[in-house]
């Protein structure tokens, strides 16, 4: 069987090489690049992201990343957002009182977590959606690695989307599966066997 081709979008943010290695370990042929043609034609596109929402959006715009994501989604070609790469898929992010427009694939805002200790950093369980493809075969007590201060804490998008939640004092979205567009707030590339299983499930679905 021919390996599935995956591009990890290089727009100046994210754990690019660790994502590349994690995807290679589950059998994908992976390229880290900002090249539009490569990003458009790959079987799957991974949009990583760490740091500030506004900085990630600025980097994405420099390489026409918004258009790449939008055209892939419109064509039904799979996209996976990770951490801030998930957050920027929403309508906006609010950091330090400043609202930054996101890619707008999902309505709603990404806002700061309300908890005694910020960021939420470490391992946590999730409540995966019934019928989830990403979490297929995983135990209910599987743990995933998070490091973030902001999250989407409500869902205003399609009622058909599969929503996976986690709790850090209050619930927040840990993953979304919405047609060709999927995303995780946790880092699958840092989440050991459980994260590898999520990536493997995603690659298998390409």
From Swiss-Prot:
Q: What residues form the catalytic site here?
A: 83 (nucleophile), 187, 189
* Pfam family of the protein (one): GATase
Q: What residues form the membrane-spanning segments?
A: none
| PROSITE patterns to which the protein is assigned, alphabetical | GATASE_TYPE_1
Query: What chemistry does it catalyse, as a reaction equation?
Result: 5-[(5-phospho-1-deoxy-D-ribulos-1-ylimino)methylamino]-1-(5-phospho-beta-D-ribosyl)imidazole-4-carboxamide + L-glutamine = D-erythro-1-(imidazol-4-yl)glycerol 3-phosphate + 5-amino-1-(5-phospho-beta-D-ribosyl)imidazole-4-carboxamide + L-glutamate + H(+); L-glutamine + H2O = L-glutamate + NH4(+)
The UniProt record describes its induction as: Down-regulated in response to the thiol oxidant diamide.
In which pathway is this protein known to take part? Amino-acid biosynthesis; L-histidine biosynthesis; L-histidine from 5-phospho-alpha-D-ribose 1-diphosphate: step 5/9
Q: Which GO terms describe its cellular component?
A: cytoplasm
Q: Does the keyword Hydrolase apply?
A: yes
Which terms does the record give in the GO molecular function aspect?
A: glutaminase activity; imidazoleglycerol-phosphate synthase activity; lyase activity
User: Major location, coarse class?
Assistant: cytoplasm
Protein's cellular compartments: Cytoplasm
| Keywords in alphabetical order | Amino-acid biosynthesis, Cytoplasm, Glutamine amidotransferase, Histidine biosynthesis, Hydrolase, Lyase
Q: Name one GO biological process term.
A: L-histidine biosynthetic process
List the CDD domains.
Answer: GATase1_IGP_Synthase
Q: Could you tell me the superkingdom of the organism this chain comes from?
A: Bacteria
- Which PANTHER family does this entry report, sorted A to Z? IMIDAZOLE GLYCEROL PHOSPHATE SYNTHASE SUBUNIT HISH
Q: How does this chain assemble?
A: Heterodimer of HisH and HisF.
Question: What exactly does this protein do?
Answer: IGPS catalyzes the conversion of PRFAR and glutamine to IGP, AICAR and glutamate. The HisH subunit catalyzes the hydrolysis of glutamine to glutamate and ammonia as part of the synthesis of IGP and AICAR. The resulting ammonia molecule is channeled to the active site of HisF.
The UniProt entry, under HAMAP family, shows: HisH
Put simply, this protein is called Imidazole glycerol phosphate synthase subunit HisH
Q: Which organism is it from?
A: Mycobacterium bovis (strain ATCC BAA-935 / AF2122/97)
């Amino acid at each position: 069987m021919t390996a599935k081709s995956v591009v990890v979008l290089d727009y100046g943010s994210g754990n690019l090489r660790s994502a590349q290695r994690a995807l290679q370990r589950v059998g994908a042929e992976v390229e880290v690049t900002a090249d539009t043609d490569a990003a458009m034609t790959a079987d799957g596109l991974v949009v990583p992201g760490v740091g500030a929402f506004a900085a990630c959006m600025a980097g994405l715009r420099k390489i026409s990343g918004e258009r790449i994501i939008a055209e892939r989604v419109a064509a039904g070609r799979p996209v996976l957002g990770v951490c801030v790469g998930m957050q920027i898929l929403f309508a906006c992010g609010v950091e330090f009182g400043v609202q930054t427009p996101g890619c707008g694939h999902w309505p709603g805002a990404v806002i700061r977590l309300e908890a005694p200790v910020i960021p939420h950093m470490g391992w946590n369980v999730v409540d995966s959606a019934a019928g989830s493809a990403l979490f297929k075969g995983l135990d209910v007590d599987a743990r995933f690695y998070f490091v973030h201060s902001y999250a989407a804490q409500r869902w205003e998008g399609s009622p058909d989307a599969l929503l996976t939640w986690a709790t850090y004092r209050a619930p927040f979205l840990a993953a979304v599966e919405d047609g060709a567009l999927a995303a995780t707030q946790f880092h699958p590339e840092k989440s050991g066997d459980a994260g590898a299983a999520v990536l493997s499930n995603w690659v298998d679905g390409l």
